[in-house]
């Protein structure tokens, strides 16, 4: 076992850690992807003074932004404020985050020579993230902290496309036309992802979530051939830390079993489910002993409280059916991130409702 696993916080009262470890929590745990973000006025006030990348590398700012939704909403977990491309910066990739666009890569990676020129993650470059984790572990007291990283496929898509993409056409074309370069790229990105998560785990995060945001663009056959082995290596490399690990993607109903299998070496495994798939159905698709996370449609939060309440109750009921169907536990979340236009008061009320059910 990794030495850091022996010194990790003991949080026996955490509903989140109970649910993901297959124990019965004293209340339904709830947190939200992108809970620290543009829906919060206090976040917008801070970001008015800092661009996204500088915010991600300022330990005290990362700490404050991560804590904001915990204070406001009483969620059962904090997730480290970061961006999916931060580890790419740690590996020397020239990129920027452009308002209204997202990450933009200065020199996309599209050839064998481009792949060969890529450098490994330098831990010193991401030292502020470790510093932020240490601050947060001290400040959160009884609330677990979830570490954060993008999965190799999603990082590959940003690198190959040069930024966000609707169809991931260049990515899939390279994958199919030049599998040698593809797998070489995925090996390097796997090492970067593992290194970035090790930085967070060594600093004390209590769990990790790996976001494969764009994996839903793939068929099951292509996912298994070109992606799953690399994602599986991420989780296998981190298994000795002894922390729960979550694997999440959007539009991945047909991939849930394979995404669950990639998690297999982890001591406690969680698969995130989006709103398109019923949790009880997802429970039959994942590996035995897997907990589920999700899956309220983020748009529901814009539809008024009566709609939110009805939908939230349905998700909690579906989560209980999922546990009856074999899921190890259920963590209430959205099926994707909080939308910027979401009323934070609705989120606070939603947390209170879920805790009461």
Swiss-Prot record:
InterPro entries xrefs = UROD/MetE-like_sf, Uroporphyrinogen_deCO2ase_HemE, Uroporphyrinogen_deCOase
Give the subcellular location: Cytoplasm
GO annotations of cellular component type: cytosol
Q: Which SUPFAM superfamilies match?
A: UROD/MetE-like
Presence of the UniProt keyword Lyase in the record? yes
Site residues, Transition state stabilizer: 83
| Pfam families associated with the record | URO-D
Q: What domain of life does the UniProt record list for this protein's source?
A: Bacteria
Enzyme Commission designation: 4.1.1.37
| Binding-site residues, substrate | 34-38, 83, 158, 213, 336
Which HAMAP family would you find in this protein's record?
Answer: URO_D
Q: How does it assemble?
A: Homodimer.
Q: What is this protein called?
A: Uroporphyrinogen decarboxylase
Organism of origin is: Mycolicibacterium paratuberculosis (strain ATCC BAA-968 / K-10)
The record lists the lineage as:
Bacteria, Bacillati, Actinomycetota, Actinomycetes, Mycobacteriales
